Amino acid sequence: MREDYSETGDAWNFFTHDHARSRAYRWGEDGIAGISDDKQKLCFALALWNGKDAILKERLFGLTNSQGNHGEDVKEYYFYLDSTPTHSYMKYLYKYPQAAFPYADLVETNHRRTRDEMEYELLDTGVFNDDRYFDVFVEYAKDDAEDILVRITAFNRGPEAAELHLLPTLWFRNDWATWIAESNRAPEQPNLRQIKAAAGTVAVAATHRLLGEFTFSCEGEVPLLFTDNTTNNDRLFPGQ
């Protein structure tokens, strides 16, 4: 279940997983191994792509209450491995198949099963056969109250080389759109921009009227991709 602002209160079906990648959230965000400030204005999470999926793996996949034979159910394998009481250190593991993620198979097979049958799990689909998956570890360590170090480590558990793209993602929750009530709307849109960085690194300045400015930097002179966190109306609501 995601956000619901439908006229009928159909919380399970109003905001689908297919819509999630193209639709700006109003009240909360999701992501793999994600963190944010306490108001969830500035967010960070990991996206991945195995070269086989039709979409980026930006969030966990699960069945809604009507799709699962035992109700709502996440169909992924992820583990919170470690954390200090203050969250000054956290460690997370996500297991990402090297084959195309079987979204349709999970939905269709579970929908056909009765409540008396076993659930059809991701492992049952065969995508983990021969250990053809990646173990992706995400670690956070605080160097200071507002200085967080991030380490992402991926291991290929399969018998052969396989493609994997790691896409660390920094974004602002959309609180400036015109569909937000004026009393809750941010007076101006925050900004992400590339700035000059030390040799062998790239850096982004994240500027928000309430939060101030933060710097996001990473090792390697890797390409940066910038997008606006807005709803893709042409894809979701063509002709409207």
Features from the language model and the residues they span:
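Anionic coordination/interaction segments
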Residues: M1-Q240
